[in-house]
UniProtKB/Swiss-Prot annotation:
GO cellular component, one term: cytosol
Species assigned in the record: Parasynechococcus marenigrum (strain WH8102)
Stated name of the protein: Tyrosine--tRNA ligase
GO BP term (any one): tyrosyl-tRNA aminoacylation
Family statement: Belongs to the class-I aminoacyl-tRNA synthetase family. TyrS type 2 subfamily.
């Protein structure tokens, strides 16, 4: 009998937006499935690369979808190769940027890298860690300064010779900047080549990336071919929209959920995700089966929020957060109607958070309000207020919301 055509397992294809090599997607699926089967037959785990440039200090759920896929490969017995771009971070990825990025110092990059590894679970049990740091052979953490910092000028010139200016200008970000007359520094053309060379250095079988990284991932495949290495597959995942359900999740847009947020803040934010984004959140951030979830969007939100919070903090903490949100600050159910009211009639807007707390009588003074906010004791609708100077434009923005101090003081704000 002829052998059956191999197909990708569900854990791998879930949420996948694109797969290299280019051409018929079915062929790419079958080729990767065949490589998986061959690796299993040979007892050789695939080497799955994910590169991150530590240009900031915090990871949010939008970033986490790539790490979740990398963890899925680990759990299937393959080797995750996490590349910390400590060298490339000093150049800065030009993807999505309309101007040259500010270059970071070695010290800044090292500090950010340490923070990233902690957030990914370096010191956590693997049950709640994003990556498995515990199981031998499942994770390699590499720094691309290992092979890039020692490159001499002939090697750099040789690397530059593998690409063309036409290729670089075909990259959407460069094309837009060139067309608008915005300067493009020559070192920025190096970035895709250096990131691509990472795949050569670590002998990657698969590289993960967001759909905005298609050019860079393809460059890695091209360079592997140039250096006579086995060519990698490029597996691309979608860009997660933020809490507004419209724009991509981004700290600068204020629509993020951070990995280190406490359970109540995380749950409270997630259960307010727009209806149009719920299915993507379920698919990309959980292992839940959409077909088994309630059709009611509100119930689906709750199930998603519980699952995501549990994946970071454990089910017990997630269930407590769900109960706290429902009974104290969720705005639904009998308990919510028992929260005492606080009038905004005498509040002068725009109002800063510290002033608001004292104006509605939750804190005795502005100085106490500042202290409580800085201590992490203040929440609005379950979401922690961290900045005493956070500003609210009008009473309409706060109408009906619950302001919380500590574990026992709650006030529903009324205009």
């Amino acid at each position: 009998m002829p052998e059956s055509t191999p197909s990708l397992p569900d854990w791998l294809s879930r949420g996948m937006a694109d797969l290299f090599p280019a051409g018929d997607p079915t062929d790419a699926d079958q080729a990767l499935a065949a490589r998986l089967a061959q690796a299993e037959k040979e007892g050789r785990p695939l080497r799955v690369k994910l590169g991150i440039d530590p240009t900031g200090s915090n990871i949010h759920l939008g970033h986490s979808i790539l790490f979740r896929k990398l963890r899925a490969f680990q759990d299937a017995g393959h080797t995750a190769v996490l590349i910390i771009g400590d060298f490339t971070a000093r150049i800065g990825d030009p993807t999505g940027k309309c101007a040259t990025r500010v270059q970071l110092s070695k010290e800044d990059v090292a500090a950010n890298a340490s923070t990233y590894l902690r957030q990914l679970g370096q010191d956590q049990p693997k049950e709640t860690a994003l990556l498995d740091f515990e199981t031998p052979g499942r994770l390699e953490v590499r720094y691309n300064s290992e092979w890039l910092e020692g490159m001499d000028l002939p090697a750099v010139i040789g690397l530059l010779g593998t690409g063309t200016v036409g290729q670089m200008l075909a990259k959407d970000d460069f094309s837009k900047r060139y067309g608008s007359g915005t300067p493009i520094a020559l070192h920025e053309f190096l970035y895709p080549l250096l990131q691509g060379y990472d795949s050569v250095a670590v002998n990657a079988d698969v590289e993960l990336g967001g759909t905005d990284q298609k050019f860079n991932v393809a460059m890695g495949r091209d360079l592997q071919r140039h250096f006579n290495k086995g060519t990698q597959f490029g597996l691309l995942l979608p860009i997660l929209v933020g809490l507004d359900g419209v724009q991509k999740m981004s700290k600068s847009l204020g629509n993020v959920v951070g990995l280190e947020e406490d359970p109540l803040s995380m749950y409270s934010k997630l259960e307010k995700v727009g209806d149009g984004a719920i299915n993507d959140y379920v698919t990309l951030l959980t292992d839940l089966d959409l077909a088994t979830l309630p059709e009611n969007p509100r119930e689906k939100q709750k199930a998603m929020a519980l699952a995501v919070t549990a994946s970071r903090h454990g089910m017990e903490a997630a269930q407590k957060a769900q109960l706290d949100a429902a009974s104290l600050v969720g705005g639904a159910g009998d308990a919510a109607t028992e929260v005492p009211g606080a009038s905004l009639a005498e509040v002068n807007f725009p109002a800063k958070a510290f002033y608001l707390l004292s104006a509605v009588g939750i804190c005795a003074s502005s100085s106490e309000a500042r202290r409580q906010i800085k201590g992490g004791a203040v929440r609005l609708e379950g979401e922690k207020i961290g900045d005493p100077n956070q500003e609210f434009a009008s009473a309409a923005e706060l109408e009906g919301k619950v302001l919380q101090l500590g574990k026992k003081t709650f006030r529903r704000l009324t205009a």
